[in-house]
Amino acid sequence: MQWETVIGLEVHAQLSTESKIFSGASTAFGAAPNAEACAVDLALPGVLPVLNRGAVERAIRFGLAVGAKINSPSIFARKNYFYPDLPKGYQISQYELPVVEGGHIQLQVVQDGKEQEKTVRLVRAHLEEDAGKSLHEDFHGMSGIDLNRAGTPLLEIVSEPDMRSSAEAVAYAKTLHTLVRWIGICDGNMQEGSFRCDANVSVRPRGSDKLGTRCEIKNLNSFRFLEKAIDYEVRRQVEILEDGGSIQQQTRLFDPEKGETRAMRSKEDAQDYRYFPDPDLLPLEISGNWIEEVKKGLPELPQQIRTRFEHDYGLSMYDALLLTGDRDISEYYEAVVGKLPSDPKLCANWVMGEVSAYLNNEGKSFDVCPLSPAQLAQLLLRIKDGTISGKIAKDVFRQMWAQAGTESISWRNSEGVDEGLADRIIDSQGLRQISDSSALENLVHEVLAANPKSVEEFKAGKEKAFNALMGQVMKAARGKANPAQVNEILRKKLTE
């Protein structure tokens, strides 16, 4: 029997507010345990929650970015369960009337070497507070509780079960990760837990429209773990069904060392949490004016820019996807193209190639690229006008990078930089290509005279001989001859 995988994701994005969702305590990462837990976070008697306006605004921003409905009123509810790192005995979340309802994510999936577009529908995105953290490693026979994270604002983004493979799930998660950083609502730091995924996975006979029993894999904090966990879980469920067994609805954890999921507990349903409206929080009213105000502050979104890059610049879907994976990359690329609009593909190749490689090697982001877009564009112009070859350009780029300095200053503040840096390096080292036809003809004549055997081999039909002669001409010119011109002159001389 052939099986179809069905996947839905629940993503917890930590919102980039400086204070918590219902208290004034700091959300900064890395403080000593319990140093950033106030009376509200500790659930001391008599304290009351006060809603953080910034968290609501970020939720609205997300809803507008995905074409969702913004609910007004929106209701906060108590989600009741017991766990040591949940001091109140309940979590303030949303059940009925979340802030964001519906919407969709458009993504590009590269699978089996093919590029395809897919739309994943969203069920909702609701606000909630994070729980604390249980610490087991540093204690013998007991656990420690760190409540710094308790009360941190989260936006839980719930998708419909529209994904059919781990590749689609990873593409969705990456697209969502890009979006929340792009619109400035989450820093997306997966190592610090700012962006975590829960995957709901089931399988069913191919062609069936009935959903199978799902298992939820919790707290996947890397795209690689997300892919591996889904692939393992699909294999596990298929093996059970093909052996005549049945799938138990469970919450499972992924063990990255063993590359497998293991049961954590039986999976709860909504009624197990006994949701009811929180009596300490009034229904949230979101005015049309507030929504319009947030809408005006939205930047151009990644999907819109991808479409424009493909249409206006003639880039492939793959290139457009890479260039919109981060807002800083996209803005840097557009600034380079603004200086060299005649060749957006050449600009894309260098931004994704040399510039990305050097930044990655130094652990820097595009925001602090030491070369300004104008400096890079001038170098690319020298390739385009034949002043230097692509090979020499890479050496010039290396020297430009070294001379541009090591300070982490944004290229957006690069007024007064030496825009003639590429030309100075080229001229000071005599790197300009020989493009004079008569000079190149003399070089070709000398090489042909010195290599009669290769000439005879070419005339006998051996194309490798031409490459050898080409190499000899470039060697004689110390790499400074224009390769395209040399190729043309050499072929002409050999066929005379």
Curated annotation (Swiss-Prot):
Root EC class: ligase
InterPro entries the UniProt entry points to: Asn/Gln-tRNA_amidoTrfase_suB/E, Asn/Gln-tRNA_Trfase_suB/E_cat, Asn/Gln_amidotransferase, Asn/Gln_tRNA_amidoTrase-B-like, GatB, GatB_C_1, GatB_Yqey_C_2, Gln-tRNA_amidoTrfase_suB_CS
Catalysed reactions, semicolon-separated: L-glutamyl-tRNA(Gln) + L-glutamine + ATP + H2O = L-glutaminyl-tRNA(Gln) + L-glutamate + ADP + phosphate + H(+); L-aspartyl-tRNA(Asn) + L-glutamine + ATP + H2O = L-asparaginyl-tRNA(Asn) + L-glutamate + ADP + phosphate + 2 H(+)
UniProt cross-references to SUPFAM superfamilies, sorted A to Z: GatB/YqeY motif, Glutamine synthetase/guanido kinase
Function description: Allows the formation of correctly charged Asn-tRNA(Asn) or Gln-tRNA(Gln) through the transamidation of misacylated Asp-tRNA(Asn) or Glu-tRNA(Gln) in organisms which lack either or both of asparaginyl-tRNA or glutaminyl-tRNA synthetases. The reaction takes place in the presence of glutamine and ATP through an activated phospho-Asp-tRNA(Asn) or phospho-Glu-tRNA(Gln).
Recorded family membership: Belongs to the GatB/GatE family. GatB subfamily.
Protein's name according to its UniProt entry: Aspartyl/glutamyl-tRNA(Asn/Gln) amidotransferase subunit B
Species this chain originates from: Nitrosospira multiformis (strain ATCC 25196 / NCIMB 11849 / C 71)
Originating gene: gatB
